[in-house]
């Protein structure tokens, strides 16, 4: 019996062995999906590989442009200011007769008095800023991320006070008696707005200027005799270019900024994007001739891409204030740091900094009696783009809920600068005596020439043949 069982088992094994080649012959080789998709497991054609690497470099440059625009926006303002007025913690330019179209800067507000300066904590160490009372202001880092509001929404509650701004790497003692904040960047943007008084039928800037000139800035540890006296140059009536670069200097200025600031100022993933186009802190930036072409293409195309998004609007409609009207909010429902409910809205952030600067919690808060709102429109009531060749009437209803003031301003759609019309200040506000209609409403007119019967304070001049946006 044992011998018979062994023979049967051996025969069965031979039979199975005989079946294996047949089963294997019926199976087809399985290639992975990516192998099928990319050249059947072989390297790319060298020309295709070069082309794809160039395309990736270009796409990364576009992404870098959009991501770093908030910083370049601030750098443009700083460089234009310091070229005109000089730099230093003690230099605080004030637009004492209000800002007009001769100052090229994104969406300036001609209806308050602007004070703007650029502090360097790496050079000067911790700085103390004595802020005036009743200022509408903020300190931001150079990505225009709010360090703190100043004024009614800030810790001083419109009483003014001493703010202590610490560098990002500061580890020393922190004295009491200050509103103390630490900046993520060595460079800090100081932006104060002071409110004008109502004069004889028009705004009176003098009290606002006087208040702004009570600002003081000095190093925390400086000996009093070594503190530089404050300088308040007048920015009004001067032609000043404070716009961000539109050519290859965008990249050289970005590289200088990356080198100057601490590593922690920029998150690692963004640094990775910058590294992929050759911008690495502490290393030479030497793009090849081909990369120079791609960088130039990116700095030309990226702003068009941002503008295309602004022009076409959002599929989710979050940019609209009302479903039945054309007014938009430039934050599109996001926080002042561009956070939607579950993501960072990088496209909306880029759209904002193409035409504006200075985003703060006070601008997006929904608290009655506090903060500010900036609804704008690029279209008329029928949905057509506003054109400077046409005549438009904006009706402001009676009882506008503005505690301090309301204002209406026209801007260029491309970069938010003021239209270069004969009327240097394309703005009006509630400080003017503007005739009211029988129902208490006010009519503001936009046109290349003033319509008959319209008072000067109710007219905003536009540039024929050019689109514009109107902000309330």
Locations of the language-model features?
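Residues at the start of alpha-helices and the adjacent loop-to-helix junctions
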Residues: 2-3, 17, 53-56
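Bacterial N-terminal signal peptides that target proteins for export
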Residues: 1-10
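Sec/Tat signal peptide C-region and signal peptidase I cleavage site
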Residues: 20-25
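Bacterial N-terminal signal peptides
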Residues: 9-18
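A compositional/structural signature for long, glycine/proline-rich flexible linkers
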Residues: 26-472
């Amino acid at each position: 019996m044992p011998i018979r069982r062994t023979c049967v088992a051996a025969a069965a094994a031979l039979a199975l062995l005989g079946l294996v080649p047949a089963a294997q012959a019926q199976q087809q080789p399985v290639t992975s999906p990516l192998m099928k998709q990319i050249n059947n497991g072989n390297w790319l054609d060298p020309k295709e590989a070069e082309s794809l690497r160039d395309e990736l470099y270009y796409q990364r440059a576009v992404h870098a442009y959009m991501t770093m625009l908030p910083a370049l926006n601030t750098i443009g303002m700083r460089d234009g200011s310091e070229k005109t007025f000089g730099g230093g913690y003690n230099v605080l330019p004030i637009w004492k007769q209000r800002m007009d179209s001769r100052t090229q800067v994104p969406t300036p507000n001609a209806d308050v008095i602007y004070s703007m300066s650029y502090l360097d904590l790496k050079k000067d160490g911790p700085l103390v800023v004595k802020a005036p009372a009743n200022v509408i202001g903020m300190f931001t880092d150079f990505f225009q991320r709010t360090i703190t509001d100043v004024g009614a929404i800030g810790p001083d509650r419109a009483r003014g006070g001493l703010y202590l701004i610490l560098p990002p790497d500061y580890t020393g003692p922190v004295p009491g008696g200050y509103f103390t904040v630490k900046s993520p960047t060595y460079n800090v943007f100081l932006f104060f707005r002071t409110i004008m008084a109502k004069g004889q039928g028009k705004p009176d800037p003098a009290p606002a200027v006087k208040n702004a000139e009570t600002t003081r800035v000095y190093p925390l540890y400086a000996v009093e005799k070594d503190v530089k006296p404050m300088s308040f140059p007048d920015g009004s009536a001067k032609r000043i270019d404070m716009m961000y670069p539109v050519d290859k200097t965008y990249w050289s200025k970005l590289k200088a900024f990356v080198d100057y600031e601490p590593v922690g100022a920029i998150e690692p993933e963004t640094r990775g994007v910058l590294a992929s186009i050759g911008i690495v802190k502490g290393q030479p930036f030497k793009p090849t001739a081909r990369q120079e072409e791609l960088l130039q293409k990116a700095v030309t195309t990226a702003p068009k891409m941002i503008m295309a998004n602004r022009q076409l609007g959002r599929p989710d409609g979050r940019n609209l204030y009302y479903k039945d009207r054309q007014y938009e909010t430039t934050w599109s429902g996001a926080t002042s740091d561009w956070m939607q409910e579950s993501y960072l809205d990088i496209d909306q952030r880029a759209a904002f900094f193409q035409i504006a600067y200075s985003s703060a919690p006070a601008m997006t808060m929904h608290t009655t009696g506090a903060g500010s709102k900036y609804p704008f429109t690029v279209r008329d009531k029928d949905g057509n783009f506003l054109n400077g060749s046409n005549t438009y009437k904006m009706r402001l209803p009676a009882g506008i809920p503005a505690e301090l003031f309301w204002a209406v301003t026209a801007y260029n759609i491309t970069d938010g600068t003021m239209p270069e019309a004969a009327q240097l200040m394309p703005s009006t506000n509630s400080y003017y005596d503007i005739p009211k209609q029988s129902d208490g409403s006010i009519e503001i007119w936009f046109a290349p020439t003033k319509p008959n019967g319209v008072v000067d304070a109710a007219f905003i001049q536009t540039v024929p043949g050019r689109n514009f946006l109107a902000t309330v």
